[in-house]
Regions:
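Duplex nucleic acid-engaging cores and interfaces of nucleic-acid transaction enzymes
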Residues: 13, 26
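Alpha-helical segment of the N-proximal tetratricopeptide repeat
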Residues: 90-114
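Structural signature of alpha-solenoid helical repeat scaffolds
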Residues: 18, 54, 83-84, 115
Length: 261
């Protein structure tokens, strides 16, 4: 039934032309289906179509199979002095400059969110640089998502912030593993709470925290303690370590991702 599968995946890819992730995944699996039918022209066509979206998982796989060097640019173009002066001459720019000078990061984050409540591409792009410089990861992602909804093309680095937060007792796993879970679970929002009660950056359930944590402070406290970024990351890291040691997961990151959820 590979022929039928190829047709379904092809139609799936074409019907979702505005969703690059589904377009890439549909194209990739169409190519895989045609590979079973030895239809090399079709394989090449659909792999190339998937490769047009290199910032997606299946786009990267397609690039790798085709031997195409990833065109992803991780550099960020800095604004020139003229653009900077234009921004700082705005009332919102003046307020941000004042907050930076007196060192008030929380108020700075609030101001950036407020000034981007109405879309202005120039202001949003400048705000991104400020958010990245001050490691305001959640704010950075909110602006990125808003700009992308309006069709803006941004350097991919903006979509993957690296916050300053660390687990209370330091990293015992690769930091990138925790960054990935924070990105997916809470978009780096330390105050996030799901309808099921999962809390904070790593979306930890209070019951899981009390079960997994060796920290007496967490075992004795109410759920709001999980809004503390360092403690939340500490519990999340302990939970990931626990899962990785299970025989059913055996250090497999794909299985880990499924088990965490």
């Amino acid at each position: 039934r590979y022929k039928e599968a190829a047709e379904f995946f092809s139609n799936f890819s074409i019907s979702l032309k505005d969703n690059v992730w589904h377009q890439a995944s549909g194209s990739f699996w169409a190519a895989r289906s045609y590979a079973k039918l030895n239809k090399y022209e079709e394989i090449n066509f659909w792999l190339n179509r998937a490769a047009k979206n290199p910032d997606s998982f299946y786009g990267l796989l397609a690039c790798n199979i085709l031997g195409i060097e990833s065109p992803i640019d991780w550099e960020i173009n800095k604004f020139n002095s003229s653009e900077k002066n234009n921004f700082l001459s705005l009332p919102s720019g003046m307020r941000i400059q004042a907050l930076v000078q007196v060192g008030l990061p929380l108020q700075l984050e609030d101001e950036i969110i407020y000034m981007n409540s109405v879309l202005n591409v120039d202001i949003a792009e400048w705000s991104l640089q400020i958010a990245q410089h001050f490691n305001l990861a959640h704010t950075q992602l909110k602006i990125v998502n808003k700009l992308q909804q309006y069709g803006a093309t941004l350097p991919i680095k903006y979509s993957y912030p690296t916050p300053l937060w660390k687990p209370k007792n330091g990293f015992k796993l690769q930091p990138e593993i925790l960054y990935a879970f924070m990105h997916q679970e809470s978009m780096f929002n330390k105050n996030a709470k799901s309808y099921r009660g999962a809390m904070g950056l790593m979306q930890v359930m209070p019951s899981t925290a009390k079960f997994i944590s060796k920290n007496k402070e967490i075992k004795r406290s109410n759920e709001n303690i999980l809004k503390n970024p360092e403690l939340n990351l500490e519990v999340g890291q302990e939970y990931i370590e626990y899962l990785l040691k299970l025989d059913s997961i055996n250090n497999n990151l794909i299985f880990l991702t499924a088990a965490y959820n």
